[in-house]
Amino acid sequence: MNNIMIGRFVPGNSWIHRLDPRTKMIVTFVYIIVMLWASNWQTYAWTAAFVVAMVKLTDQPFKLYWDGLKPIFWLILFTVILQLLFTPGTPILFSVGPFQVTVPGILNAIYVMVRFVLIILMSTILTLTTPPTSIANALESLLSPLKKIGVPVAELALMLAIALRFVPLLMDEMQKIMNAQKSRGMSFSTGGPIKRAKAIIPLLIPLFIGALQRALDLANAMEVRGFKDAVQRTKYRILSYQKIDKVAFAALIGFVIIFFVIKTWLHG
């Protein structure tokens, strides 16, 4: 459980760490949109190369990202199986009961798996190299024009920061509860997937109670510090774009142009 990396910030001084958080959010958003346009192995290879380069620039071991993918392995596997069994087409390779496994089904399964993994990796890069408070400030800055039409941008940014901070906290709490149960003879690593899932059920009530307690503690802490919404606040750190951000935007534009060149030339 403590392998989940989304929401965890790892301090560093890498090229990605030094980028303005707004730059990283824009790059992540544009990348996810571009991923939705990928339709052949060449475009997927190009988007994968971009993520690998980003991972390299974080100066963090790839094993850190790999460990972060392990907790969602079963979700990825379930999605792949759905694509294999429910994608029609020809030629038909073999049948599994009433289901037929086709070549288009295999290709769709591979593409969905790659898309899933790449989007998770890109999102992990954002949270791994950016503190939750910086992500909230970046979101508030990017969405600030919406204040004119009454959108509570500051409150949305605060909720995002709290949610990102609570993800690793809840995972750590889950790990503590699991360790306590293991010390009493409970096993979470034996049996099939269904048995393992049933073993998780007794953990939900103490986890839910712990989450509520943390939420109450946070609410009390905010209240005693005089927190109020819908007020104008100053910032301790003012966000400003630097030369390194211009380089990042240039790289992003180059990535998008090359992507659509590949897609157009290969009739993807």
UniProtKB/Swiss-Prot annotation:
Q: Quick check: keyword Glycoprotein in the entry?
A: no
Entry superkingdom: Bacteria
Location relative to the cell: Cell membrane
Q: What is its main location?
A: membrane
Q: Which CDD domains match?
A: EcfT
Q: What is this protein called?
A: Energy-coupling factor transporter transmembrane protein EcfT
How the protein assembles, per its UniProt entry?
A: Forms a stable energy-coupling factor (ECF) transporter complex composed of 2 membrane-embedded substrate-binding proteins (S component), 2 ATP-binding proteins (A component) and 2 transmembrane proteins (T component). May be able to interact with more than 1 S component at a time.
Write out the GO MF terms.
transmembrane transporter activity
- Can you name the source organism? Leuconostoc gelidum subsp. gasicomitatum (strain DSM 15947 / CCUG 46042 / CECT 5767 / JCM 12535 / LMG 18811 / NBRC 113245 / TB1-10)
Q: Which UniProt keywords apply?
A: Cell membrane, Membrane, Transmembrane, Transmembrane helix, Transport
Topology with respect to the bilayer: Multi-pass membrane protein
